[in-house]
Amino acid sequence: MDTEQAIEIQEKDPVSSPPAEIASSPERFINRELSWLHFNRRVLEESVNPRHPALERVRFLSISANNLDEFFMVRVAGIRAQVREGIAERSPDGLTPLEQLKVINESVSQLAIDQQAIWRDLRKFLAELGIVLVDGQDVTKSERAWIEDHFLASIFPLLTPLAIDPAHPFPFIPSLGFTVALQLMRTSDGRPMNALIRMPGKIDRFIRFPGSKDGVIRLITLEQATSLFIGRLFPGYTVKGQGAFRIIRDSEIEIEEEAEDLVRLFETALKRRRRGSVIRLEIEANMPEELRAFVQDALSTTDDEVFVVDGVLAMNELSQLTRVDRPDLEFAPYVPRHPERVRDHGGDIFAAIRQKDLIVHHPYESFDVVVQFLQQAARDPDVVAIKQTLYRTSNNSPIVRALAEAAEAGKSVTALVELKARFDEEANIRWARDLERAGVQVVYGFLQLKTHAKLSMVVRREGGGLTTYVHTGTGNYHPVTARIYTDLSYFTSDPVIGRDVTRVFNYITGYAEPIDIEKMAVSPLTLRKRMIEHIHGETSFARQGKPAVIWMKMNSLVDPDIIDALYEASQAGVSIDLIVRGICCLRPGLPGLSENIRVKSVIGRFLEHGRIYCFGMGQGLPSAKAAVYISSADMMPRNLDRRVEVLCPLQNPTVHQQVLEQIMVANLKDTEQSWQLLPDGSSTRMKAAKGEEPFNLHNYFMTNPSLSGRGKSLKESSPRRLTRRNERNPS
């Protein structure tokens, strides 16, 4: 192994077939859904990582729960729909939809049990640290008096007690809705009644008691506080039994082939989604059996859609606990750097780009430079046109404001707003209307393709002609997520890249297929072909006895054709290192198939989101002659075939070196936040080699300047050079 770390790998025999048979059988792939569940388990494992502060561990637990909710809303919902429709088509790994549901349920059941066990331990740990979550029966006399006043003033007006009988049918419960079910008895005549109390979704789940002794913070959940005062909601009734439940609904949106008004179509589809079928019903374990049957029957759920939870529901809301004022239990604040080269030019972003290409590495370097790029364009009298894609952005988005400002200043502004960005559809409809009111030409792209490419283009009058400035990146134009996602922003005034981006926009706005793209590759047209050609190229170098190396960094590796090409390359002797944060359907390390492929996943303080693809071109890696790309695309069929994505080459020597020799090497070198993927799809934590210090790539970039953004500061500070053990060209 030519990486700098020694890795302890558990010996496992994931498949019974010999390698020769695996190479042509479905067993060569790991199931996509199970691979995602393995990823979510890695996230969950960070909640027990002693290196993390306590509240950050709670945050990781919350993230794993939120991830699981979305998995059911989208992936499980889709598989259940296939089962309902009688579709028996097998996944690439050979499972029918029904078989996939079975293995998913088995894996999720254990994951949910582990989440609850971890929460019980974390709750005790927080109490030791002075953050106490109390149950209703444990409140003190003074706390009960305070919570009663608070309940009547701030909670009671928001609650609607719902009796269930022929005159009061079971109400609609929204997805992720948290509800308390009750068995009541009228005290006057003993008459039984079932009832519901829907917990309001717009207020905090955790209520903090005022005052404390010795700095101890005491909190109670909204549902526990409500349970103390059921009599206020149902006077004249006695509670005989109760329990909370929560549902998850199908969140897929079906789009009609023929649509005259795409915005109106999505508004209608969003209303339908709110009433999607229930695909998961979570019920507290202490709910009486009769009451549980009542809820299940009312929601028309089958037994395999019901999950009995021995613990807390809606664990995604545990993230609210991180709002308590205990900075000592969180990561130390980090303030992103501003690229020194932009400062050297007095804040003139266009002058900085004219000097040479620039890579901004988020979140270590501020996303403000991207906002500044558009704000300066909006206010610069020499700028005549701006074109922009928007997939996801933030509330009160400065990107949207800058585009509106530019249009109001009389510039030609075109914005592609992707309405099909899952769970951001409503926000994007709102942004589209705001932009149209400001005079922006808004388009929605293709009905059957999502535009996922991250592109911004500014055309400026310079020296009697026009210069095109381009920003393209791996992440969304979202200032909030840019503080916690690792992504790359690439700025260039390369006229060839400018022409390529112009053609991509023409493709999006006018369906003009960009047949003469010069440097970039675009899906669904040429990106897959470019990737396969590069993989085959390294395979050919290996067969000629030349150095042959591939490094890739992505979120997901699913596409069967890409995986098979990598298998072929491995069999030819190509050295392949893959950094895959999430889903990986490739089996690494199988003799005769993938023994030259190593796969790792980095899970840490920041969410790894950038996509980088590197090919040695017969020189090995790292090498100044390597082909290095950044992209918005993962290696999934949806990115390669059903989305508009771009693959952008990095050819400026400094930018090339920064991405290849600094960013990629740091990712490969990391041992403190990395997991080694095993042939069966599971993973094990990586460890530094004996006698060597653990390496944390996030800490490295928080304390070392980037190569392309240093400017004059190069004289005062250079990044610590990274090397990998046996840094040589493999032959």
UniProtKB/Swiss-Prot annotation:
It catalyses: [phosphate](n) + ATP = [phosphate](n+1) + ADP. Its EC number is 2.7.4.1. The active site is at H452. GO terms for biological process: polyphosphate biosynthetic process. Gene3D superfamilies: Endonuclease Chain A, Polyphosphate kinase middle domain, Polyphosphate kinase N-terminal domain. Its cofactor is Mg(2+). Keywords: ATP-binding, Kinase, Magnesium, Metal-binding, Nucleotide-binding, Phosphoprotein, Transferase. The keyword Metal-binding applies. The keyword Magnesium applies. Catalyzes the reversible transfer of the terminal phosphate of ATP to form a long-chain polyphosphate (polyP). Mg(2+) binds at R392, R422. Belongs to the polyphosphate kinase 1 (PPK1) family. Residues 713-731 have a biased composition (Basic and acidic residues). GO terms for molecular function: ATP binding; metal ion binding; polyphosphate kinase activity. SUPFAM superfamilies: Phospholipase D/nuclease, PHP14-like, PPK N-terminal domain-like. This is Polyphosphate kinase. An intermediate of this reaction is the autophosphorylated ppk in which a phosphate is covalently linked to a histidine residue through a N-P bond. Pfam families: PP_kinase, PP_kinase_C, PP_kinase_C_1, PP_kinase_N. The lineage of its organism: Bacteria, Pseudomonadati, Pseudomonadota, Alphaproteobacteria, Hyphomicrobiales.
